[in-house]
Every structure is written in structure tokens, then in C-alpha cells.
Amino acid sequence: MGNNFSVESPSLAPFLCGKRKYLYNLERNLEALHKVMQDLNAMRNDLLKRLSKEEEIGLQGLQEVKEWISMVEEIEPKANRLLDESVSEIQRLSRYGYCSLIPASTYRYSEKVLTTMEGVETLRSKGVFEAVVHRALPPLVIKMPPIQLTVSQAKLLDTAWARLMDINVGTLGIYGRGGVGKTTLLTKLRNKLLVDAFGLVIFVVVGFEEVESIQDEIGKRLGLQWRRETKERKAAEILAVLKEKRFVLLLDGIQRELDLEEIGVPFPSRDNGCKIVFTTQSLEACDESKWVDAKVEITCLSPEEAWDLFQETVGENTLRSHQDIPKLARVVASTCRGLPLALNLIGEAMSGKRTVREWRYTIHVLASSTAEFPDMEDGTLPILKSIYDNMSDEIIRLCFLYCALFPENLDIGKEDLVNYWICEGILAKEDREEAEIQGYEIICDLVRMRLLMESGNGNCVKMHGMVREMALWIASEHFVVVGGERIHQMLNVNDWRMIRRMSVTSTQIQNISDSPQCSELTTLVFRRNRHLKWISGAFFQWMTGLVVLDLSFNRELAELPEEVSSLVLLRFLNLSWTCIKGLPLGLKELKSLIHLDLDYTSNLQEVDVIASLLNLQVLRLFHSVSMDLKLMEDIQLLKSLKELSLTVRGSSVLQRLLSIQRLASSIRRLHLTETTIVDGGILSLNAIFSLCELDILGCNILEITIDWRCTIQREIIPQFQNIRTMTIHRCEYLRDLTWLLLAPCLGELSVSECPQMEEVISKDKAMAKLGNTSEQPFQNLTKLVLDGLPKLESIYWTPLPFPVLEYLVIRRCPELRRLPFNSESTIGNQVETIIEEQVIKIVEWEDEATKQRFSHFNNRDFVQMAEDPKMDGLTSESHPIQTIDLVGTTGSGETATANNIQGKKVVQSGTHATVVTMECQTYKVFTPDCPINNMIDTPGTNFLLCYT
């Protein structure tokens, strides 16, 4: 019957013949499937081990490797299921033979075996990777032991605190020689002030004593935002705010008496309860200041305390490694003469020296170095010089000296340093990623040696003044480093031919017409000269060997001369934070250029020359020219591009950008503004996995999504390992940010004006994606700002440790009933906490201790302008300001201070607001009886909106 059926049904014959080929080879295919699955699993496990090992040294898995592992995890259960069913299917096949009575399910099974085997084989062929990782950004903070005070230092802290709290003391001066611990004491005082809820605490590193720099730091703390205001205007605005506040101003490192009135700081008095504390190396700075009420001197440690500190730094294991080492160690410690800085530096340098020969050699080097400084009384520079001489790696020495180009005790971006070193050719690695790894490792080494100090939430480093003094002494023959507001014109150098590197920072120079004959100059750092407007072409005429040119933060600089095209060896050009309007056409001649930074150049209109810079590896346009399809085509010509920062406006551009894998995978910073997100308002970040900073403004995003598949295996590195900063402003439909669970290194999160935001991390979504995971978010978060989120109910569903949190702001979140804090949160940290009084009243605290800890600092002590700082200077036509908030001013007729918004259009975006009318240089606050919108629309009137 079966034979008759097959003969009499010719239309089915091809079907049966086609299917039987699966049956004939079923057993062979099953054996092959079993073998290739074993091979595939072995390859997958090897990759996981390699990834895990590389993760330990700070590297990150390549996206293509993650996707391959994810596909293996998808196909593995299908193959295993087929193999589990193989016995019953083979038995069924044996029972029926290869006849037409075989069930259709067996045919389907045989077909699945073959197609699955082919899929597994394809995966196996694609599973060979020469590299499985690329560089992840370094840890936010290099773990260093906390500073422990000696007995005398602890007593000194108590003394300083008692004097500061004396009602008759308004200003306290702390003085002592460099390296003795003045900054440490000032930091300890700051921490005690924060714990004791004194009020507004402002910490300023004075640097070059530039009045406007001090004003800017104070203004930043007060929420004031300036661009081109005069020094006098800034002083008036600072004074208007501070005279209504109880504040403590901490000034670290002044060298002469400061004019408080010029800065805008009111004098402390018994009536206002304000305090000022400053540190200085000069007793005269204390004695000459008519406003100093008390002084505290810091002296060097006693011999026994110095020995205790030295032992602690060197470590017991080293001291016990040979019986003669403790005696030799006392000789080394004695050369430091009780100076904590020197003890820490030389102690760290000797912590790995475990032979008598090494210790004796160090004593010899110290003696030799002392002979180089016969006029030095304290012996500090000889110690520092001996540490430098003891560096075994010449590359580390060069990198260390490079750091001296920047002002003392001021932040230097780690990323900036690494980029300088790469472009200078200091780093030995030819591959850029390997060079970046080497650069960050060198920074880590210098921090561990205590020659650099971490700052800026771990993203920056700075150099102690005495360490920098030694570095400049070593490099003095080839370095020129100047700065400060006393400098009004370019300096004269006896022999420009000797100069290799020059730094001119924070001066009053306005125009440059000089033509220095400096053909050997390779590095010119000309930053933060706030009044610089014009540079002549002759200035660059003789700089034929220039490799690095940094003109960043010269905010008045509007153009570059065409003569810059003669810098044919230039590899690094930084024009960020300038008001430059266009790039010289001659820039296209700079064929050696590999790094071009145009971040925050909001006046820049076009960048057509980019298409000619074919060797570019780094291109930065964050908060600059918006990407369009023409610019995208130009960027695609840059085949060597490794890093890209962009501003994107428009859905078509965004879609096209994310579809080009080479460009998308190189994006480090993305500013997405006023863009309609297609696909139902869902923004997928899968393609931009190297993202470091994401800034979203005014987009219709409903949800931000990522590919969660790569997180099922615990061994896989989180997908967004690099992202450090996230800013979201005015995204009307966004409800949560659960994807941040995959951003373990997130350092700063700011979310404002998102009316539909209900949760920061959604418990339901997290459980659905990750299951009952024990991973806790925000382990590296230093700054959290939540403002204007009327529906926000939850940040996270359980208390979190927040181990490095430093700054917390929660305002205008009326539905927020619980905060993810308990008495163990932020333990060991001093957190500047600004929580609106209304929020404090409605929050259900874990316990009274938690409430006291996080609720002591409210809006009466703080002024915060909520205008997006990235919009500063933009015209109302291009970006109407949605809200500007002034906290702490209520009631009819009060005078308030705020940012100058002359000529800017302000529109209402909320429902409960107070209107502030501009009147000369003050603002009158009142509650209107008529609808706010009617008043906002009044022609010729400027308003501030103040939420109450």
C-alpha cells in the first residue's frame, strides 16, 4: 500500500525525496552536532576565562565577543534538547525504517538537527578572536589608604576647631611650611563643618590668586552661571547671595592678603555668624591681613611621630625583611626632618625595597641630592630629587615632568594627560588602545608614589606645590611655565631655542602680536586666559616643530589666524570652550593632526575642513556643531578614527548614525537634543557601547533600552562599563532609567524636568531582566541630582551603600516617600546634602539617625540655578529657557539675586511657580494674582520662574 501510494502520488515524491535526505544522515548528523557543540562550549568557556582575567586588569570585552557568546547561549539549549530526544527518535526510525509511514514529526526533527548543526558550525567558525578586549576606562578612584592623623595632628585639629567655633573669631589663618599638612587640616575642618551642619560650606583652591578664578569657584557653589560678566558684576552677585547666608569659606593656599570686597565676600562678624579659614605658607599673610582674628601654626612632626608615620608608609613586611633595615630606615626618615609630605613620598618609594643594598644606595642618593641644593635649609627638594632619580623608567619620568606644566593644586584631567602623552610620542606603544592603557597605568603609578594626588571624583589628578617646584627645577632648562593675573603680556625669554615646552595659564593677556623664534618648541599649553581675544599669525611663524597646541578655555577667543596651517607637525589641537566661529581653511593642511577637540564651541558654524584631516583618531564635537548627513559623510572618510564626541539633533541623523557600526562604536560622548525618537519613543543604546557621557535634552524618549542578553552569564562584563556621566533634562515621557544597572562605573547622574519619571530603577523591570540579582547600582556614584520630577516615587527599592557619594540634591519631587538610605549609607563620606524641606517632611526615613544625617541641609542654605549650563550664551530664538529656578526666596517684595538673563526669553513649564521680574541688577519676587502665562507673554518683560 505504501508503494502504491508513493507511485500514485507523484506530487508528493519530491517532498519525500527531499525529506529522506535528513533521515539517511540523521545518526551521522547527531554525532556531528554533539561534537561541534562540545567544541563550541569549550571555545565559549575559554573566552569567558580570558574575559574574566582581562577584566581584573581593567579591560573590557569587545561587543562582537559578547554578541558571539550571547548567540552561543541562545543555540545551546536548542542543541541540547535535540540531543536529549535523539534516542527516542533513532528508535522510532529503526521501527519504521525509511518508509512513508514515518511520522511527520521525525522528518521535522531530522531537519532541525541538520539546520542546528549548520548553525553551530557557523558559530564555531566565527568564534576565533585575535583580541577579546579593549581598554575600559580606569577605576574612578585609585584606592589609597585614608589619611590617619598623628596624635599631635589630632590635637591641632581640635585646637583649630575650637578657635573657629569661638564666637569672637570670624577669620582663622592656618600657616606653615609647604608639605607640613595644611591642606589636610583644612579638609578635616571641612568634613567636620559638613557633619555639624554649619550651613553653606565653600572650599576653594586659590591657585594663582586670580580674583576671578576664586569668584568662579564660589559662583559655581552658589549655582551662579557666568560667561562674560565683569569682575565687579560677579562680586555684586556673590555679595547679594552671601550676605543673606550663614557660610564658611575655606581658601587653600593664599600667598598674600586677599581683598574680600573685590571678590564679593562679606566680612564675617558675630552678627552674621559667618567664618573664613585660609591656609598659607607665609606668616606675613596672616599678620598683614586686617581681617584675621586668630592664627594656628602647623609645625613638623616630632622625631618619634615622624618615625611612626614612616613605618606605617613603608610597611612591616619591608621593615622585617632584614635585621639591618630598621636602622637604615631611621637614617632615611631622619633626612625628612619631620615633614609629612617627604615622609610619605620617600616611605612609599621604599615600601618595596627589601635588601640592605637598596637602602644603603638610597642613603647615598639622598646625600648626593643634598649636595645639589646647598642653599636649601629644609632638605625637602633633595628628597624629592632622589625619588625622581630613583625612577627606573624614563617614560615615567617624562610623564611626571609633563604634569608640572599645569598650575599647582589644580585639577588635570587624566584623559587629557594621556592624550597629550600619546600625541607627544612619549608613550611607547604604537597601537592607540595599548598606549591609552599604558598612560593610565603610569598615572596610577604616580598616584601610588604620591607624586600626584587624585581629585575631581577620581577623573583628575593634581600635583602638590612642592612636588611641582622640584619638577620645574629639573625641567627648568627646557620648560617655561607662567601664570596668574599679574601677567598682562607675553614674557621675554633669553634664548627661545632652548625651550621645548611652554605653559601660559590664567593670565590677563588680551592680544598676542609677538613672534618668538622658538623652532624647538613642541608643546604650547595656552589655557584659561579669560581675556585673550586675538592671536597674530606671526606668533606661530617660527613654531615649525609644534606638536601640541592647547588653546582651551580662552572664552573670548573667536578666531585662529590662517598661519596656523604652517604647523605641519601638529598632532594635537584643542579649541574647546572658546567662542571660535569658524576654522581656518588652512587647517586642512595639517595632515599630521590626530586629535581635534572642539567640545563646547557653541558659536562654531561649520567644520568642512574635517574631511581633509584623514589621520584624525580623536574628534570631539560635544555641545558644538550639530551632526548632519553631510558631516556624517565627512567623518566616514576618517578611517583611523577611534574616538568620537557628537551633538545630534534630528531623528534621521540619529538613525543613520546608529546604523553605521564603525562610527557608533567609537562614540564616547553624545549630546542628544530636541530629537524625536522613532520606534515608539524607544532609544536603543546597543550600538554605542563605548559611551562615557550621555546628555539628553528635550527629547520625546519613552524608554532607554539596551541588550540585556549579555548579562545572563555572571562572567560577562557589564555592557556600559565606561559610562561615567548621565544628564537628562526635559524628557517629557521618560518613566525610568533601569538600564543604569548595566553602568557600574556611573559617577554623576542628573535628572531634571521629567514629568512622567516614576522610578529611577524599576524593581519590576530589574527582576524581569536580571532575576533576583545581588548586584547593587551606584557603587561609584559621586553626584546625584533629582529635580523637578513630580511623579517620582522611588530611586531604588532597598537602601544602598553609596560608598563614594559626595553631593546629593533632591528638589521638587512631591511624591518621593522613601529614599535608598539607611544609617550605613555613605559611611565614611562627608556628603553635601541639599534636600528640599517639603521632601524632608514627607519622606519615610529608615530611622531617626538616617533622617538627621541626610536632612540637615535644606533649601534655605542654598541657591541653585536650574538652567542647563550647556545652554549658557545661546540665544532665546534657538533655545528658549524652560525654567530658571531660584531656591530660598519667598514672599512678596523680597530682593533676590540670580544669573543675568538680559534678553533671554523665559517661558513657563510648570504649574506652581513664583514670578521674578528683572529690575536693574536685582529681582523682585512676588506672587501674581493673574495667570502666570499671561504675565510671561507680556511684551518687553523678562521673568525668572521660581518654584515654591
Curated annotation (Swiss-Prot):
Residues covered by the NB-ARC domain: 134-432
Single GO MF descriptor: ADP binding
Protein name (database record): Probable disease resistance protein At5g47260
Stored Gene3D superfamilies: Helical domain of apoptotic protease-activating factors, P-loop containing nucleotide triphosphate hydrolases, Ribonuclease Inhibitor, Winged helix-like DNA-binding domain superfamily/Winged helix DNA-binding domain
LRR repeats by residue range: 498-519, 520-542, 545-567, 569-591, 592-614, 615-636, 640-661, 666-686, 690-711
Coiled coil: 20-57
Species per Swiss-Prot/TrEMBL record: Arabidopsis thaliana
Residues that coordinate or bind ATP: 176-183
GO biological process assignments: defense response to other organism
Domain of life: Eukaryota
Domain notes: The LRR repeats probably act as specificity determinant of pathogen recognition.
Short name of one Pfam family: NB-ARC
